[in-house]
């Protein structure tokens, strides 16, 4: 199953993206989600196939969500994941001596 998908970036939350079928645009996305998502800025279009690898999402889940509900919401990474990637110097900067 091949799908042409448009990916939009949230104006309210860094790292939050919305995947929709290009042919549907944002028509199938619920109003409540759009209110929480903010202004949708088009990032790029992508051809999705089950064989394709995505950087931070499971392609099978994305394709299933697009088929069933018409969109897939990619949430930003958890805050703990950001902290794990900080240099040791920054992690210890405010530690008491």
Swiss-Prot record:
Lineage, opening ranks: Bacteria, Pseudomonadati, Pseudomonadota, Gammaproteobacteria, Pseudomonadales
InterPro entries registered for this protein in UniProt: YcgL-like_sf, YcgL_dom
Gene3D superfamilies referenced in this protein's UniProt entry, alphabetically: YcgL domain (3.10.510.20)
UniProt domain YcgL: residue ranges: 3-87
Database matches in SUPFAM superfamilies: YcgL-like
Name under which the protein is recorded: YcgL domain-containing protein Pfl01_1389
Residue runs in coiled coils: none
PANTHER family reported in the protein's UniProt record: PROTEIN YCGL
One matching Pfam family: YcgL
């Amino acid at each position: 199953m091949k799908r042409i998908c448009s990916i939009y970036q949230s104006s309210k939350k860094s790292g939050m993206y919305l995947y929709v079928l290009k042919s549907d645009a944002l028509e199938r996305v619920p109003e409540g989600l759009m209110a929480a998502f903010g202004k949708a800025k088009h990032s790029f279009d992508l051809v999705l196939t089950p064989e394709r690898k995505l950087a931070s999402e499971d392609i099978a889940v994305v394709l299933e969500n697009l088929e069933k509900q018409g969109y897939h919401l990619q949430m930003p990474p958890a805050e703990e994941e950001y902290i794990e990637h900080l240099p040791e110097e920054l992690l210890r900067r405010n530690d008491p001596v």
